[in-house]
Structure formats: structure tokens, C-alpha cells
């Protein structure tokens, strides 16, 4: 199967602009019904906001933790809706990963984010363009906005937010350029390993 190729097409220090431009690209995408959300939560308040927004969301330690005596993996098993701040703070930072139906929750998720790295992924299929020899590639195509990051795969924290277009595992620079032009942008460097 392999991974998509992810082309960065916008970098900005304004999260709202990144989200808005990603949504403009989504208008060109034959979207799947589900959207992937991920976030690094650094405060108890952020955890509570996300728990209220995404009841039943999957929370886990950002970094692997092991028991100092047994060496076994320590799972995160607190109920984030009932744990007090002190209990939550002992486990921070936490990761949230959730697949949700496309809809209003995605915009609310973007507004509720804190300063940790986060991403929204819209998977789907770019339309076929026979004249340009572009075929949609459903396992690979899509749009991703990464908040506080410049890598399609998790990387270092940055001040900036990056929008990626994902295409076939073989890459499609021509399509990426056309998609970037749709939002008044351009391809900003080499293709990265995508989803």
C-alpha cells in the first residue's frame, strides 16, 4: 500500500488562516465521511475542553511511560471527565486521537486548540483530470492542516501552521501545484512522507 506524498502548500503564523485555506482545498476533494483529529494537550484545561467536545475521545500519554519497577508500559487509564486537575497534570502532556464525522465538531476542535501540536486530516479523492493525466487516488488523496508544525508526520513544534495536500504514493507535483494555486499559494519544498 505505502504512504501518500504530502506537499506543503501554505505556512502561516495564523491558525485561522491555515484552517480556512485547508477548508477551501477540501471543497475540491471528494471527501470521506470521517475526519481524523489529533492534538497534544499540555494543560488540564485543554484536556477538559477536548473531553467536553469529544466525549469518548481516545487520550494517551504523549511519550511512552514505563513502570520503574517492572519496566512494563504504563497505560493512561484516567477518566478525563472526572479526574481532578492534579491527577491530570501528573500525566501531561496527553495526546488525543479521534476519528469523527465530518461536520461542525471539526471547526469547534480547531477553535479549542491550545499551544500543542495538532492536526486535522480530511481523506478523500481528488477528481480525475484526464487532460492533465491526473487520476484520483482514494487511499492517498486529501488535505491536512498541522497546527504548530511543519511536518506531515509528527515532528518538532513550531510557531507556524502548515497546510498539506496529499496525493498518490508516487507523488504528483503538477497536481500539488494546481491545488496550491487554488488558495493563492505554491508548493513549499519537497514532498514529505504522508499518511
Where in the sequence are the language-model features?
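Structured alpha/beta or helical-core interaction and ligand-binding surfaces enriched in interleaved
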Residues: 1-195
Amino acid at each position: 500500500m505505502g504512504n501518500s506524498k504530502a506537499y506543503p502548500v501554505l505556512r502561516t503564523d495564523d491558525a485561522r488562516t491555515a484552517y480556512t485555506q485547508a477548508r477551501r482545498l477540501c471543497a475540491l476533494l471528494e471527501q470521506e465521511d470521517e475526519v481524523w483529529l489529533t492534538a497534544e494537550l499540555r494543560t488540564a484545561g485543554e484536556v477538559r475542553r477536548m473531553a467536553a467536545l469529544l466525549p469518548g475521545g481516545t487520550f494517551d500519554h504523549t511519550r511512552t511511560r514505563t513502570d520503574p519497577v517492572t519496566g512494563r508500559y504504563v497505560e493512561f487509564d484516567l477518566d478525563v471527565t472526572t479526574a481532578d486537575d492534579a491527577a491530570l497534570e501528573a500525566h501531561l502532556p496527553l495526546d488525543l486521537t479521534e476519528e469523527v464525522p465530518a461536520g461542525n465538531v471539526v471547526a469547534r476542535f480547531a477553535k479549542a486548540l491550545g499551544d500543542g501540536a495538532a492536526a486535522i486530516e480530511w481523506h478523500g479523492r481528488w477528481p480525475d483530470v484526464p487532460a492533465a493525466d491526473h487520476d484520483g487516488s482514494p487511499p492517498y488523496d486529501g488535505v491536512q492542516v498541522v497546527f504548530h508544525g511543519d511536518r506531515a508526520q509528527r515532528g518538532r513544534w513550531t510557531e507556524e501552521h502548515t497546510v498539506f495536500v496529499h496525493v498518490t504514493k508516487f507523488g504528483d507535483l503538477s497536481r500539488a501545484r494546481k491545488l496550491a494555486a487554488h488558495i493563492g499559494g505554491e508548493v513549499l519544498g519537497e514532498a514529505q512522507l504522508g499518511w
